[in-house]
Amino acid sequence: MDQLLPPAPLLDAARFELAIRRLADSLGHGTDRSMFRGAGQEYEQSRPYQAGDAVKAIDWRITARTGRLHVKEYEALRRVPVWLLVDTSASMTVGSRRPTKYEAAVCTAGGLALACLGRMRPVGCIGVGGRSLVVRPTLSRLATLGWLHRLRRYRLDEPTDFAASARLLEPLIAERSLVIVLSDLHDPTAAARLARIAQEHDVCLLVFRDPAERGLGAGILRAREAETGRALTTTGRFPTRRAEERLAALRGAGIDGLVLDTDRPSTARLRLFFSRRRPLAGRRP
């Protein structure tokens, strides 16, 4: 049975849109050299001056070194598309407190999407779970808000199928793209598939973590896994390091990422993370 994300912190539809717009403004501020950069120009080389060249294009450093006028040539950058892979599985929707991992992921996806649109970067989305959600990258704000509102609905029994979602994505990406994955990495098949995608595209990973996954108090803990129903018994003092361990393993495949705890502010960390990433056009294929 489908359920709607609870009233707070996403509130109603209008307040949900307001929240992600504010996040988009915060993420986009001061990050023009990061993932949010879209169309523009990139320096390619300098060549000798020719009659008719603009004075503002003169490369004064090369001119001073050679004694001959040189001008800079620039290469136009394409509008590199962005794909958001949002984990919609049951493990994302269950948490020890609000917001859940899923609530945080949907809000973050919304902020990233609108920030990219503000920089003229087309954005698409694929739901990583049992539902059918595939939206090709677009510059349409209306279409983007449409799939964001679809993400507000969730199921408590939805499985993860990262492998199937990745197989679906691969033939859809005809050109080099930026792929941002928002997940808790509970699916063990995710690492291999992401490594394969990273061979052709720029991939980064945002891992959402519930406070309980950092470790509980003393004592024995009995629990049941939300998606598979598998029961387990563990000690509360043992912190869950799965997110960091899997993220560290993926770095070897050229995938960088960030662990986001749902009980801690994330906007500043996200802004810093993306501002420090090299633009996709400068990353090695």
Each predicted region: which residue ranges?
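Exposed, interaction-prone extracellular/peripheral surfaces
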Residues: M1-M35, Y43-D53, I62, G67, ...
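N-terminal juxtadomain amphipathic helix
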Residues: V55-A57
